[in-house]
Amino acid sequence: MAAAEQKGKKPRTDGAEAEPVDAALLQSIEKLQEIQDEIEKVNEEACDKVLELEQKYNEVRRPVYVRRNKIIKQIPDFWLTAFLSHPMLGELLTEDDQKIFKHLESIDVDDSEDIKSGYSITLTFSPNPYFEDTKLTKTYSFSDDEAVKVKATSIRWKKGMDIANDRAYTKKGDKRILIDESFFTWFNSEKNRSFAHGAMDEVADVIKEDLWPNPLKYFNNEFEEELELLDDDDEVSDDDDEEEDDEDQGEGEEDGEEN
């Protein structure tokens, strides 16, 4: 059957001319491309308008964020708890990082005056035994050629307190050497360097787009889990009390029957 089909086909020779393209089809494709270009232009204009609106409301939100930070400072270990409760960020904090984060008073994300040109993340600490700086800032600048330039504060560690260098350690019963990478290693990574726009910093993006807008959501996760544990303990305690009451009642009935 296959051989018969092959016989029915005309072999194509090198000298065979391609079928002429339908002029009407070409014209339709050209018109479609014009429409598509028009749609792209409208999309770009819409994007610019959205960014203008976002920039306007960034100014409106700023004093609200300032008030929020004042309240957060009154809650012990707020940012440490929020970080640890976050499914991604919680994995970045080593035990040493957690000790330092107890001194973290505020996190601030600030878009550039031209919102398309970048943003900065600033961590503000109370005076602490780990480093001299009270403010650590990491800035991302976007250029017209879609490159990203990163600048970060050089942390001035106090003597013997530098935990930003990866530490090698072994677990008991495990011969493998494991690397304990500090959050502050990320903070100083890629500093004063440029890279392609597509190679975004996932940690910075999560802080900016997820943690920063509503950190209370993650702080409450931990708080609600503690409340659930307390409720579970209360339920177990109530069950134990009921069992004891039943046993006492049963013993009382037995004593009555004997009498």
From Swiss-Prot:
<feature type="region of interest" description="Disordered">
    <location>
        <begin position="1"/>
        <end position="20"/>
    </location>
</feature>
<dbReference type="InterPro" id="IPR037231">
    <property type="entry name" value="NAP-like_sf"/>
</dbReference>
<dbReference type="GO" id="GO:0005737">
    <property type="term" value="C:cytoplasm"/>
</dbReference>
<keyword id="KW-0143">Chaperone</keyword>
<dbReference type="GO" id="GO:0000724">
    <property type="term" value="P:double-strand break repair via homologous recombination"/>
</dbReference>
<dbReference type="GO" id="GO:0042393">
    <property type="term" value="F:histone binding"/>
</dbReference>
<dbReference type="GO" id="GO:0006334">
    <property type="term" value="P:nucleosome assembly"/>
</dbReference>
<feature type="coiled-coil region">
    <location>
        <begin position="21"/>
        <end position="62"/>
    </location>
</feature>
<dbReference type="Pfam" id="PF00956">
    <property type="entry name" value="NAP"/>
</dbReference>
<feature type="region of interest" description="Disordered">
    <location>
        <begin position="228"/>
        <end position="259"/>
    </location>
</feature>
<dbReference type="GO" id="GO:0005634">
    <property type="term" value="C:nucleus"/>
</dbReference>
<feature type="compositionally biased region" description="Basic and acidic residues">
    <location>
        <begin position="1"/>
        <end position="15"/>
    </location>
</feature>
<keyword id="KW-0539">Nucleus</keyword>
<keyword id="KW-0963">Cytoplasm</keyword>
<dbReference type="InterPro" id="IPR002164">
    <property type="entry name" value="NAP_family"/>
</dbReference>
<dbReference type="GO" id="GO:0003682">
    <property type="term" value="F:chromatin binding"/>
</dbReference>
<dbReference type="GO" id="GO:0000785">
    <property type="term" value="C:chromatin"/>
</dbReference>
<comment type="function">
    <text>Acts as a histone H2A/H2B chaperone in nucleosome assembly.</text>
</comment>
<protein>
    <recommendedName>
        <fullName>NAP1-related protein 1</fullName>
    </recommendedName>
</protein>
<keyword id="KW-0175">Coiled coil</keyword>
<comment type="similarity">
    <text>Belongs to the nucleosome assembly protein (NAP) family.</text>
</comment>
